[in-house]
Amino acid sequence: MDGDIENQVELEEKTRLINQVLELQNTLEDLSARVDAVKEENLKLKSENQVLGQYIENLMSASSVFQTTDSKSKRK
């Protein structure tokens, strides 16, 4: 009789551990998918940032407000 109870306890413990492992595997898969999504978003934002940086540079170079003037050479 004690053997049956011990076997039942072991079986319940194994079942609990298997369920815990499966839950952790699912969590890991979810986290891995999230990391991949964040990496993709990061690459997209880097690309957009480069485009915006180039756009700002072009605007600044086309605007007289941002042109550097050497006032000392004009005075001479």
Curated annotation (Swiss-Prot):
The keyword RNA-binding does not apply. Belongs to the SCOC family. GO terms for biological process: positive regulation of macroautophagy; regulation of protein complex stability. Keywords: Coiled coil, Cytoplasm, Golgi apparatus, Membrane. The lineage of its organism: Eukaryota, Metazoa, Chordata, Craniata, Vertebrata. Disulfide bonds: none annotated. Residues 6-52 form a coiled coil. It comes from the Eukaryota. It comes from Danio rerio (Zebrafish). It is a peripheral membrane protein. GO terms for cellular component: cytosol; Golgi membrane. This is Short coiled-coil protein B. It is found in: Golgi apparatus membrane; Golgi apparatus, trans-Golgi network; Cytoplasm, Cytosol. Pfam families: DUF2205. Positive regulator of amino acid starvation-induced autophagy.
